[in-house]
């Protein structure tokens, strides 16, 4: 048996939650000790640099990248429009990668793990191989994100465009999910959504594995922070809510309170009115353990929030929303707020009590250790591979 791992962007550097999820999958696939080839697209936003991949990873598998121009264009949109396909997916079609897949040796059983629906354009050529079985790993139900965008915008042109993109994407998602040999959703929420689409393909939830962390957060700290890539609209909206609606109210009661905002694709800005923009943080573990209370008023999106899981693994006290906690099983140590007023109140309770910060943080940490163990996740993957 051999493995072919396809990604729509380089795994390294791990600049966002998607890369983090792919890094975890790559490490799991290598842990199976099955010979592995890794094909990745390189885009304008996510260029390829071989040296960003750790040396031990490069030594354990064959890595090849293919340049893709994915920045949306009017010409590209109308070409896709008249061809009747999804522009969201068509942008990731590269002839060189298709040829490489077509020529990939299939003289022995081959498992292909495809990251996200954005690589669905390669399914037809993959299915021509007699010995290949395709597993699609779903990070989100992508068409649902575009429906949410359509519902959120007040611009009638954007509403029409987003609805059109969602409908085209939904058709191709259903087709791809139906043609795959197996689906690997990250969460039970997405697994249920796939079933509701009428998909009969076997679906096995493969959560994001997290290494156990021995250290815990510093519970003497009661300042606030948010971390997330700022090229993702739900994170942009959450930061705006924090800065404009939640933090100013808290600042009245706690004049010396600070809010740190961190994440890739954001600029550093000096402390102003208690808010500091840190940009990308190189030592995530240290940042999580030393920054206080994670506040994440996420109001849109689907799939699991990788940064929340990472913070939970470090025992960080967290306040978020039902959408922010989507995909994470219940009784997880997260504090869920239902309104902006409730969000502010829950933060107030944590600011006031070190014991509460410790109790909720340690509950979250224990939850992650129980449900997201790499050994448990690896066992599930190997079992599913053996079935094919």
Per-segment meaning from a language model:
Residues 162-166, 170-214:
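Donor nucleotide-sugar binding/catalytic pocket of nucleotide-sugar-dependent glycosyltransferases
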Residues 181, 286-303, 314-317:
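Acidic donor-binding loop of glycosyltransferase active sites
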Residues 205-290:
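Conserved catalytic-core segment of nucleotide-activated headgroup transferases in glycan assembly
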Residues 352-385:
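A charged, aromatic-enriched C-terminal amphipathic alpha-helix characteristic of glycosyltransferases
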Residues 8, 74-87, 135-171, 229:
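Acceptor-binding helix/loop patch of EC 2.4 sugar-transfer enzymes
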Residues 334-341, 348-355:
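Conserved acidic donor-binding segment of nucleotide-sugar-dependent glycosyltransferases
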Residues 1-61, 107, 249:
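N-terminal subdomain of nucleotide-sugar transferases
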Residues 307-310, 317-320:
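Short hydrophobic beta-strand element within catalytic cores of glycosyltransferases
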